[in-house]
Regions:
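Glycine-rich SAM-binding Motif I of class I
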Residues: 63-67
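Bacterial N-terminal signal peptides
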Residues: 5-15
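Conserved class I S-adenosyl-L-methionine
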Residues: 52-61
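Conserved alpha-helix/loop element of class I SAM-dependent methyltransferases that forms part
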Residues: 34-52
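S-adenosyl-L-methionine
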Residues: 84-117
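A short SAM/SAH-binding and catalytic strip from SAM-dependent methyltransferases
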Residues: 116-132
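Conserved SAM-binding motif I beta-strand of class I
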Residues: 76-81
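C-terminal substrate-binding/active-site "lid" region of AdoMet-derived donor-dependent transferases
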Residues: 128-183
Length: 183
């Protein structure tokens, strides 16, 4: 029985590409690298976030983008995160800050999420992950919705704006796209 269990685990590992294993599974499309707060603020500024917006952060990690969207910009926000421990951390932070009425943290894959309510979508994913997500964005998002990507472009889309931000010795690119103006 033990040999069968080991064989099943080995087979499951082989069924998932090595790049996906590195990030914890086939649905996890990027490593967990928290966005520095200066970039969080700048991404939301570049998107022109206002209190009437609904900000979706795909791969929301510890919740810093959705929390900032609610606290500093007055927006409603939804964070979608695959990793349960990060969801728990984000939910705890949201509760501690009294933002439960403005921020929702959803545990699951953003590849299967309904993005239709979003007026702003934030991303800090790899270019290949953005490519995999692009059909969902094109299907779900209405014209005028702003998509902001930190460091990694969405291939085949024309950005409305490209902003360079320096943090210490690193230089970051913030890509702003507007649905309906990406071609």
């Amino acid at each position: 029985m033990r040999i069968l269990a080991i064989a099943l685990v080995a087979a499951a590992c082989l069924a998932v590409p090595a790049s996906a294993q590195q990030f914890g599974g086939a649905e996890n499309l990027a490593p967990n690298i928290p966005t520095p707060q200066i970039l969080v603020d700048r991404m939301l500024e570049v998107a022109g976030v206002e209190p009437s917006d609904v900000v979706y952060d795909l791969g929301s990690g510890d919740g810093r983008i959705v929390i900032t969207a609610a606290q500093k910009f007055g927006a409603r926000a939804v964070g979608i995160e695959l990793i349960p421990a990060l969801c728990a951390t984000a939910r705890r932070r949201v509760k501690d800050l009294g933002l439960e009425d403005r921020v929702e943290i959803v545990q699951g894959s953003f590849l299967h999420a309904d993005l239709k309510p979003a007026t702003v979508v934030t991303l800090y994913l790899l270019t290949s992950s953005n490519e995999r997500l692009k059909p969902n964005l094109e299907k779900d998002l209405k014209p005028g919705v702003r998509v902001v990507s930190n460091d990694y472009p969405i291939r085949g889309w024309k950005e409305s704006r490209l902003v360079m931000v320096r943090t210490g010795s690193a230089e970051h690119r913030i890509y702003l796209y507007k649905i309906g103006e990406t071609r």
